[in-house]
Structure formats: structure tokens, C-alpha cells
């Protein structure tokens, strides 16, 4: 009897080892198969379609499904206009939009980064081939609204929660439907370009938020400085001048200059600051630094002052660089800058992924708010807020005024040469809503429009303030 029990114990042990080895082999083979399919996919739409046939879902923070797999087919938001508005963020399974959730979160959606024990548990439960589900920080209603606001423009909208860094809406125009990308038809010029993340725009007068912060924190400069604005006359040889107000603003101090967006004042201020100090404050706000959004890549905003002379420095100080100088900003970064001012000078790390869960509902990732850059002192941010409120209430940003809302912001216009060699003027607005219940920062860039960014931004904030945001 004892011999029988020993034999039974040995047989049981061998069986357990055999099953463990078999499961390990299955895990390795499954992982290898996924990797081989991914490597072989390249531009092969049909291979990618197979890979994504069991991929996890992508949902908005308010529970609307933006992408999911159903009976071996990858499907996108049921509301076609929402699917269109979400194209640049969600992407599609063909990876023609390489900087999208479908591509940069591929491992999570396919579940290919799981450990052996995690995969074993799912295999035993019968859902080992299913990917993980992702919940994004964006709100479906805000995404849809942003898409509608951009319908008649070329440009971008970014809306953030400035206390958490959560991305609430991101939209670009032009755009197309996901199925058009999959079928590769009806693709209009520029419709696949993610302007919000990849756009390198001249900041125009929105850069004056940075030069003002530098002035407020410069102990040797007089914040009560006055400058006589002579309109279209250059402040120094080859230097900044008024392009939209040729008659000039007269003698102005900081508040009036900020309200009227006076190039003469801020050109003189840039010269007084000098390249090193101007550059340092810009870098405090994230220029020449990496800005991340989860797994997404974002174009680095640049402030590279190579052109010699005071004239070039004065133009850089008003966001319209000349010669070898480079000053660019992405809409995503512009919204984060506005949010930093709203958040007492602290820029929060931007988030796009709220939560990741496996097929059994276990939470694998949950977003935590994190401070990113200390941009300026809290008292500097408070003074900037007063100046930005003045811009909206009685200055260049009056189009952003809305009854019952306290909106602070800064307008910008930037001249650029298009592909046809013609001068176009882009319209920019960066601002935020002063509200405990809706801490919202927004950036709008409209190409070839010199006025409407403030209107679009305020419409976005007004709508966002009217709904409950999870």
C-alpha cells in the first residue's frame, strides 16, 4: 500500500510538472505568435486586422466605447461624428496614424506585455486571447463638441483639466472617418496630421505670457517700465513693430501693453531681459523640454535664439522670430502653459490613459496626478491671471467674454508663409476658466484665421462648464 501511495505521489508530481511545462510552452508560443504577426504586419492591413480581432476596447471617461472588437472585426464609435472627431486620438487598426491609441498602446490592447502568471490565470479562465481594455481621460461629449467647433476651420483644439493634467478633449481639422482610413479613400489633404501634438506653430503674442513672467521675476527690471509705441516704426533697426495697429498705442505700461498686445513694449522687454534670461524662463514653461502624454510623442516646443542683434531678439519676444531664430509651440503645450498659470505656476503632467483593466476586470493601471514643471512663482501666476482677465474683459480677447463665466486668456496672431509663398495669419488663444468645479485650460490654433480662436476657445469652455465631467 505504501509503495502504491509513493507511486501515486510521484505520478501526480510528474503530471503537475508536465502540465506546467505545457502551459509555459503554450504561453511562449502564444507570445511568439503575437510578436511574429506584429513583425510581419508592416503595412499589411489584413494581418493587422487579424491581430486586432481580439484586442481590448477603448472607452471615454464617461463610458462611451470609442473602439472595440466584435466577432473578429474592429469597430469604432457608433456615433460617426464622434468617430470622426476622435480619429487623431484613437486612430485605427491599420496604424496609418502612427501616433494614436491604437498604435502606441498596442501592447496593452493586445495583452502582449503580460507576465507568465497573469497570462496563465487568464488562460485558465478562458479569456487568455483577449486584450486589455483602456479607459481614456477624454469625455465623449467634449470630443464631439470640439470636432463640431472646428468643422469650418483648419486647426486644433486642446482642453485640459489643469489640476490633474487630464486631457479632456483633443480635435483636429480637417479629419476623416476611421473607415475612410481603413479603406484608404476620401483622404483629404492634411486630414491625417495630428496638429494638436505634432503642430509646430509660431506662438505669436501668446509668448507674451512667458516674457511677462520673466519680467515679474527679474529683480533688476522695473515692472512699472513705460514704452512709447510708435506703431509701424521699428523699435530698433530691423526690430519689432506693430503689424495690426500701424498708428501705435502711445506710451504704455505692462497692463495696457498686455491688454492691447503691444509689440513695441514686449520687444523692448525682450531686449531688456536678454537672450539668456528669456530662454531660461521659456524652458521653465517647458520649451526645449520633452512633453509627454502617456505613450504619445509630442513635438518639442522650441525657443532657439541664434540670430544676432537686438532686432531679432525683439521679434522673438513677440513670438514672430526672424532669421535663424526658432520659436514654435504645439497646441498641446500651449494648453499646458495656460493650465500652469491657472494652477499657481505648476504644470501638471498631461494624462490620456485613465485606467487599464484585464479581461477579468483587474485594474492594471490607474492614473495618478503628478506635478511636471514648476514654471513660475505663485504670485507671478496670480499677476498673470489678472492681466489675462483684463485681456478678455477689455482687450484683444473680448471675443472670449461669456456671461457668467470668468475666463482668463491671451490672444496671438502669427504670420507665416504658406506652400504657395503667400502670407497667412494664424489665430491663437490660450486661456482657462476660473472655477473650482471646472478647472479647465484650453488652447485653440486656427490656420489662416486672424480673429476667431478666442471665440472658438470660449465656446469650448462655455460648453464644458455646462456639463458634468467625470
Where are these regions (language model features)?
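Periplasmic/cell-envelope proteins involved in peptidoglycan metabolism and beta-lactam response
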Residues: 1-184, 191, 200, 276-284, ...
Amino acid at each position: 500500500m505504501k509503495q502504491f501511495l509513493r507511486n501515486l505521489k510521484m505520478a501526480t508530481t510528474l503530471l503537475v510538472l508536465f502540465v506546467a511545462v505545457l502551459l509555459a510552452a503554450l504561453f511562449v508560443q502564444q507570445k511568439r505568435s503575437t510578436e511574429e504577426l506584429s513583425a510581419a504586419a508592416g503595412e499589411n492591413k489584413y494581418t493587422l486586422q487579424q491581430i486586432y480581432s481580439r484586442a481590448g476596447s477603448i472607452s471615454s471617461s464617461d463610458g462611451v466605447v470609442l473602439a472595440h472588437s466584435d466577432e473578429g472585426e474592429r469597430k469604432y464609435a457608433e456615433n460617426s461624428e464622434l468617430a470622426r472627431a476622435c480619429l487623431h486620438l484613437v486612430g485605427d487598426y491599420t496604424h496609418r496614424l502612427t501616433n494614436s491609441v491604437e498604435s502606441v498602446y498596442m501592447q496593452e490592447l493586445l495583452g502582449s506585455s503580460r507576465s507568465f502568471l497573469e497570462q496563465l490565470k487568464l488562460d485558465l479562465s478562458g479569456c487568455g486571447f483577449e486584450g486589455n481594455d483602456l479607459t481614456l481621460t477624454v469625455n465623449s461629449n467634449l470630443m464631439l463638441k470640439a470636432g463640431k467647433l472646428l468643422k469650418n476651420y483648419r486647426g486644433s483644439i486642446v482642453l485640459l483639466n489643469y489640476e490633474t493634467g487630464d486631457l479632456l478633449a483633443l480635435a483636429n481639422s480637417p479629419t476623416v472617418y476611421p473607415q475612410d482610413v481603413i479603406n484608404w479613400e476620401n483622404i483629404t489633404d492634411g486630414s491625417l496630421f495630428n496638429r494638436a501634438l505634432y503642430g509646430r506653430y509660431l506662438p505669436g503674442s501668446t509668448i507674451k505670457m512667458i516674457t511677462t513672467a520673466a519680467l515679474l521675476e527679474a529683480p533688476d527690471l522695473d515692472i512699472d517700465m513705460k514704452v512709447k509705441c510708435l506703431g509701424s516704426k521699428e523699435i530698433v533697426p530691423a526690430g519689432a513693430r506693430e503689424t495690426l495697429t500701424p498708428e501705435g498705442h502711445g506710451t504704455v505700461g505692462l497692463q495696457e501693453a498686455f491688454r492691447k498686445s503691444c509689440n513695441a513694449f514686449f520687444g523692448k522687454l525682450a531686449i531688456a531681459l536678454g537672450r539668456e534670461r528669456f530662454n531660461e524662463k521659456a524652458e521653465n514653461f517647458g520649451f526645449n523640454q520633452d512633453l509627454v502624454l502617456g505613450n504619445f510623442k509630442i513635438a518639442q516646443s522650441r525657443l532657439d535664439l541664434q540670430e544676432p542683434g537686438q532686432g531679432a531678439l525683439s521679434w522673438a519676444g513677440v513670438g514672430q522670430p526672424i532669421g535663424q531664430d526658432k520659436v514654435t509651440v504645439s497646441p498641446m503645450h500651449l494648453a499646458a502653459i495656460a493650465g500652469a498659470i491657472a494652477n499657481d505656476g505648476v504644470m501638471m503632467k498631461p494624462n490620456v490613459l485613465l485606467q487599464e483593466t484585464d479581461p477579468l476586470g483587474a485594474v492594471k493601471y490607474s492614473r495618478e496626478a503628478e506635478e511636471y514643471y514648476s514654471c513660475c512663482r505663485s504670485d507671478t501666476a496670480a499677476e498673470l491671471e489678472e492681466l489675462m482677465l483684463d485681456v478678455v474683459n477689455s482687450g484683444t480677447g473680448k471675443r472670449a467674454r461669456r456671461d457668467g463665466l470668468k475666463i482668463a486668456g491671451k490672444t496671438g496672431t502669427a504670420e507665416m508663409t504658406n506652400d504657395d509663398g503667400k502670407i497667412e495669419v494664424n489665430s491663437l488663444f490660450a486661456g482657462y476658466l476660473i472655477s473650482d468645479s471646472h478647472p479647465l485650460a484650453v488652447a485653440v490654433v486656427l490656420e489662416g484665421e486672424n480673429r476667431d480662436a478666442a471665440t472658438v476657445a470660449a465656446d469650448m469652455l462655455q460648453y464644458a462648464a455646462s456639463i458634468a465631467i467625470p
